[in-house]
Structure formats: C-alpha cells, structure tokens
Regions:
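Flexible coil/loop and intrinsically disordered segments
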Residues: 1-171
Length: 171
C-alpha cells in the first residue's frame, strides 16, 4: 500500500463525500459525456486516478509533495511537538474541504489542459510524465488562487514550466 492509499482511507473515515467527489471526477475523466451540454472532466491527455487528484489537493492546500508528511498532517499531528490532536485534524480537513472545489472545478481543469494542448500535447501518448502534469496543475492553481496571476501570463508560465519539467524530469 502507498501513502496515498492510507490518506484515501482517512478520507473515507472522516470525509467520505470528498473522496466520492474525487473518485467521480476521475471516473468522468475517462468517459465521453453522454450529452454535449454536460460539462465533463473528460480529456485525451491524462486519466487521473484518485491518488493523483489527492496529490493535487494536498499540493494546493499544504504546499507539500511528500505524501508521508501529509498523512501525519491530516491525522492531526503537530509537526513541532509531535503530538496528535483531534482539533488539529479537524482544522486540516477543513482546509482540504475548502480547496477541493477548486481542483475539481471543470473550468480550472479544462483551462489548464488548454495550456498543454497549446504547447502541442494533443494526446496521452505525448505526455512523458503524469507527475509533471499534476505538479503543473498545482502550480497553475497556486498562481491563479494565491497570486491572482493574469490568465494569459499564467498560461505562458505554466506552458514553459511543463515543457521544461517534461524535458528535464524535474518538477
């Protein structure tokens, strides 16, 4: 089992609705919507798994990439004292709940994917690293949410970031 599995289990215990929303988003990303009017997370570039979207949620919320650290954080561990607290766990889940709509927002998701398509990535076979896509999405959301970066500037920056992280394997 991976750290993401443990975190998803914690979500099932303390926030089942959040886990279900993440799973539904991932299911929808794999199938073409039945009606043209339905806005969907479907795309040809990446088919995210729940642990992938969890990584995005954690990256946006806690600005951390190591799932091991996140597991401790959402269990309610105070990183300074090492003590576990029910109150702290509740606060951490509240932070996750606040950011989940942002990462699952289809406008954000499709706008980000347009950045990759604009860079010449037309289908999944051209993507060499799923993690590069995920971390680029985290940076896209941080730029949009935390720094209020103009959309055209954000698209340019994230497009360059994705190409360089794909070429170098560093993100």
């Amino acid at each position: 089992l991976t750290q993401a599995d443990f975190i998803l289990t914690l979500l099932s215990v303390y926030w089942e609705e959040g886990r279900k929303e993440i799973e539904q988003f991932c299911i929808d990303s794999r199938k073409i919507p039945e009606k043209e009017t339905r806005f969907s997370s479907f795309n040809y570039l990446i088919k995210p798994d729940p642990d992938d979207m969890l990584r995005v949620l954690v990256g946006l919320t806690f600005h951390r990439a190591k799932m091991k650290d996140v597991y401790s954080i959402i269990r309610g561990r105070d990183m300074e004292t090492g003590e576990f607290s029910e109150e702290l766990r509740t606060q951490q889940f509240d932070k996750l709940k606040l950011n989940l709509p942002t990462i699952l927002d289809n406008t954000n998701w499709q706008s980000f994917l347009k950045v990759l398509i604009g860079g010449g990535y037309k289908d999944e076979e051209l993507i060499s690293s799923k993690n590069a896509v995920l971390y680029s999405y985290i940076l896209y959301l941080i730029g949009k949410q935390n720094f209020n970066t103009q959309n055209h500037e954000l698209q340019r920056i994230i497009g360059r970031w994705f190409v360089m992280s794909s070429l170098t394997g560093r993100y």
